[in-house]
Amino acid sequence: MSDQLQMTDGMHIIVEALKQNNIDTIYGVVGIPVTDMARHAQAEGIRYIGFRHEQSAGYAAAASGFLTQKPGICLTVSAPGFLNGLTALANATVNGFPMIMISGSSDRAIVDLQQGDYEELDQMNAAKPYAKAAFRVNQPQDLGIALARAIRVSVSGRPGGVYLDLPANVLAATMEKDEALTTIVKVENPSPALLPCPKSVTSAISLLAKAERPLIILGKGAAYSQADEQLREFIESTQIPFLPMSMAKGILEDTHPLSAAAARSFALANADVVMLVGARLNWLLAHGKKGWAADTQFIQLDIEPQEIDSNRPIAVPVVGDIASSMQGMLAELKQNTFTTPLVWRDILNIHKQQNAQKMHEKLSTDTQPLNYFNALSAVRDVLRENQDIYLVNEGANTLDNARNIIDMYKPRRRLDCGTWGVMGIGMGYAIGASVTSGSPVVAIEGDSAFGFSGMEIETICRYNLPVTIVIFNNGGIYRGGGVDLSGAGAPSPTDLLHHARYDKLMDAFRGVGYNVTTTDELRHALTTGIQSRKPTIINVVIDPAAGTESGHITKLNPKQVAGN
C-alpha cells in the first residue's frame, strides 16, 4: 500500500512563499479569513505586528519598504478592512514606496453574482486605481507566482503599492504538499539596474559645467536609492549647493556648508541650472513656476520617463535608477571636471546667515505658554545629541516648523507626510521605523495629526517599542481658540478639546507620560524618553494662538467670498 500523500493549503503556501523571498515581518489586523494565516506566519518565524487599524498597518509596511528597498507587507481582512488599508496603499504608490497589501476576500462565484456574501466586495477592481498593480489568485497553485509578481512590480522601476487579493476559498483550498512547493517562486534580482543613456549623462555634465548658479535638489527618490556616497562625492567634487526635500534631509547632513536650505527661496529664484535628483516638480516645488526664474534650465534624474516635462521643459532628462545615474555622472565628471563659481556660493552663504539670524531670534525667545519655535528649539538640542534616532513628523505648523528647525545628520532618518501631505501616518511610520531598525524613534506630532492614529500607542506599548511621541498641543486643528460663527456656543470647526492631557493615555497602557510647559521640562522628558527606550508620550502645552491656518500652505485654502 502506498504512503498517504501529505497535503497542504493555501495559507501555508503563501506563508512559505513569503519565507522563501526573505519576508521577515507582516503588519496587519487579523479577522476572517486571514487569522490562521497570521498564526502560521508567526509559527514559521515571520514577525507579526498586530495593529488597531489597517491604515496604520499599511503605513508601517510602507515605511519599512522605504527604509529597506524591500516590499513591506500589510495583511487585512476583507471589504471594510481592505478599504481601511487602501489609503495607505495609495499613499505608498504616490510616494514611491514598495508595499504589498494582502487581503482576504469573499468567494468570487458569489461576489460576481452579487448574491450578498459575507463582506462582499470586488476588491481587486477597487484597488486598481490606487496601486501600481493588483492581482487576484483563483487557485492555490498560483499563489507562488502571484507573490513573485507582486514583489517584482513593487520594487522595480518607480516603486509603489501592489494589491494581492486572496479569496477565502483559495486560502482554504488544499493540494499535495510536494507539488505545492514546486509552485513557489524565489524572485531573483527583483529590481535590476536601469542604466541611463550615456549621451544624457554627458549633456548633464556639460550643462552643469557652464552654469553660473547651479543647484541640486535632492528628493525622497534620492534617499530611497541609497546612493548616499555617490551623491556626496558628486556634490563635494563640484561644490554645487544642494537643497534637500524633507525626506531627503540627512543624505548630506543639514549642517553641511553646501546646504542651501536656509536660503531656499533665494536659491530657487536665482539658480540658472537645477538638477533634480529623485525629486518631482510638483506642488511641493510650486510646479517649477511661482518663485522660480523663467529661464531656469532643468536636468532631471528620475527612473520614471513619464515624469519628465510634467510641469517645466526638462533640458536634459537622465532616465535611470539614481545609483546608476550618479555613477555615470561621476565617471563623466572625471573627463570634464569643473567647480561651481565661488561668487554663487558666497552670495548663498550671505542669505543663509541672514535667515539663520532671524531664526535664532525666534528660537531663543522665551514665552509662556510655549510656541512652536522655542519648543522645537528644545527638541533640536536633544536630537543633536541623538543623531541615530529616526524622526517621524506630521501636522501642519508642527510639520512645517520642525522641518525647518530640526537638522538631520544621517540618510533616511526622517519620515513625514510626503507627497500628499497626508495626516495619520505618524504612529504607523513610527512603528515601521522602530521594527525595521531596532533604533529609538521620536514622533513629533500636532495634536490634530496624532488623533488620526493615536490608538496605536497601545500597539507601541504591547510590543514595548522605543518610541517617544511628542505632541504639540494647542487645542485645535492648526490652532486653538476658534470662533463659533453660529453664536450657539458650539466648538469651532477647528477646535479640539482644550487642555487635553494626552500624556494620561499612557496610564491605560503602562507606558510613560509627561506633561511639559517649559523648554527645560521638554529637554528632560525627551532625553529620558529616548534613553529609557520605553514607550513615552510628552504632552507639550503650546499657546492656542500659536501657528497659522494650514501652516505654510495657507494659500492653498480657498476663502469664501460671500456670507460670514
Task: Identify the meaning behind each predicted range.
Residues 219-223, 364-365, 446-448:
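Conserved short loop/turn motifs at secondary-structure junctions
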Residues 163, 300, 392, 444-445:
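Generic enzyme active-site microenvironment
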Residues 2-5, 141, 295-395, 519-528, ...:
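Phosphate/pyrophosphate-binding active-site segments
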Residues 130, 378-387, 506-512:
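A structural motif corresponding to the C-terminal end of an alpha-helix
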Residues 110-121, 265-268, 292, 309-311, ...:
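Thiamine diphosphate
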Residues 11-15, 22, 29-32, 37-39, ...:
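Active-site diphosphate/adenylate-binding microenvironment
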Residues 2-339, 382, 466-469, 501, ...:
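N-terminal alpha/beta PP-like core and its mobile active-site loop of ThDP/TPP-dependent enzymes
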Residues 165-170, 396-397, 543:
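A glycine-rich phosphate-binding loop feature that marks nucleotide/adenosyl-phosphate handling sites
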